[in-house]
């Protein structure tokens, strides 16, 4: 009762903002990075289309997102009106990741809430056809990181990549980013051990979603190219987005024993845990059954272990047969328990999935507190889905507290903070 009352006060009296200093981009030590999709477009942003909000024009039967973002702080030139959608009889709006003003605003929020930086998703399957679109968002990120003092690094998502060409596509695009866009020359590009961090997500996953390669030697050769065989200016600290069961080669991981050497070759292991558990009890079991042995294995391999945590999950609009609010957020308890357990198990760094992933209901950006604040048409999740009164920035606040915990600024506590505040 007391906790709900305190949260209700927060809705009316947001805390004063503490402006955090620039993040040290030279090391991954104690960092908490958040995935950033940056894939939303609308017709008025120059793309001439709606992307990721829906299949075509947004409507109840075309929506592919769950959470409705809180747009109250966005200016008129950041809002895209949605034809046929209303909120209380007034026009409904969405945003575009192509708008530099909006991306800058997102990074300003990260600074206000004390988040370290982002892993920007870049999709291998779209590079040949849509590289210019990805470049627009990347340039927005580079400018926003500079303004806010947050770090950023590239994270390639290989889902749907051509098994025959994805490796060369990765190499060519990385050389393009280094030579033409000068990403690794940016003062806020995330580095570690003197090299830029590069993440490649999806190798070794065996979930039926088309993650090449199937041959572990191809994967190992690719890692070695990025770490040591390319020209010096392209060398990286290699982060691998792996199956959650990378350590045992079971469940969502390919079972060929040769994959163990692939994972051992990575500098940073980032297992994908999203959707692998859905209750607090399961989170606790996951710590003992998976994270604790993972930490030991990574230490034996002299690797950085970077588990992934997520606030909840729902993709009813994206997968129409999926149930609504599939993995409830439990007012932040689910999110907090994962981060606390990871810290107590020995993890030194963390990834949060994701900043803006409203598609699968994992976003931590500001979203509406009440269903009535979302469009009247269609299914939408709001922060009151679990019956709690929460401010729209609740998950940014919690992410900030998680970051402070990993920085060593606060002691790990299994209890959810009553009033997490912007730093």
Identify what each model region corresponds to:
Residues 7-17:
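Bacterial N-terminal signal peptides
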Residues 22-423:
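Glycan-processing catalytic domains of CAZymes
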Residues 1-4:
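N-terminal secretory signal peptides that target proteins for export/translocation
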């Amino acid at each position: 009762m007391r906790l709900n009352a305190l949260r209700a006060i927060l809705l009316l009296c947001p805390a004063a903002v503490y402006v955090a200093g620039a993040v040290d981009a030279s090391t991954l030590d104690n960092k908490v990075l958040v995935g950033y999709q940056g894939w939303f477009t609308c017709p008025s942003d120059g793309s001439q289309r709606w992307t990721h909000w829906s299949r075509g024009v947004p409507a109840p039967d075309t929506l592919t997102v769950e959470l409705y973002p809180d747009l109250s702080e966005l200016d008129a030139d950041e809002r895209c009106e949605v034809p046929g959608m209303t909120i209380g009889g007034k026009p409904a709006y969405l945003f575009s990741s192509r708008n530099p003003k909006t991306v800058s605003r997102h990074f300003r929020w990260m600074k206000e809430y004390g988040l370290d930086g982002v892993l920007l998703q870049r999709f291998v399957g779209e590079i040949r056809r849509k590289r210019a679109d990805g470049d627009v968002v990347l340039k927005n990120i580079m400018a926003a990181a500079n303004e806010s003092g947050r770090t950023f690094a590239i994270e390639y998502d290989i889902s749907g990549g051509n098994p025959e060409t994805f490796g060369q596509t990765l190499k060519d695009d990385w050389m393009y980013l280094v030579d033409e866009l000068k990403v690794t020359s940016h003062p806020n590009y995330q580095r570690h051990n003197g090299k830029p961090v590069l993440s490649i997500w999806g190798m070794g996953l065996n979930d039926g979603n088309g993650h090449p390669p199937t041959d572990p030697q191809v994967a190992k050769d690719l890692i070695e190219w990025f770490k040591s065989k390319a020209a010096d200016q392209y060398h990286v600290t290699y982060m691998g987005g792996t199956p959650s069961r990378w350590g045992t080669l079971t469940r969502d991981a390919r079972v060929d024993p040769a994959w163990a050497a692939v994972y051992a070759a990575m500098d940073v292991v980032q297992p994908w845990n999203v959707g692998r558990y859905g209750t607090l009890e399961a989170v606790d079991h996951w710590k003992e059954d998976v994270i604790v042995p993972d930490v030991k294995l990574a230490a034996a391999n002299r690797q950085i272990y970077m588990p992934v945590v997520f606030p909840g999950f729902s993709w009813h609009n994206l997968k129409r047969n999926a149930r609504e609010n599939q993995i409830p957020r439990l007012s932040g308890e689910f999110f907090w328990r994962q981060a606390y357990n990871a810290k107590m198990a020995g993890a030194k760094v963390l990834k949060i999935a994701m900043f803006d992933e409203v598609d699968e209901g994992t976003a931590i950006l500001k979203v509406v507190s009440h269903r009535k604040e979302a469009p009247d048409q269609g299914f939408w999740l709001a922060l009151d889905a679990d019956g709690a009164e929460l401010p729209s920035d609740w998950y940014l606040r919690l992410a900030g507290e998680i970051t402070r915990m990993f920085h060593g600024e606060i002691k790990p506590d299994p209890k959810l903070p009553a009033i997490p505040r912007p730093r």
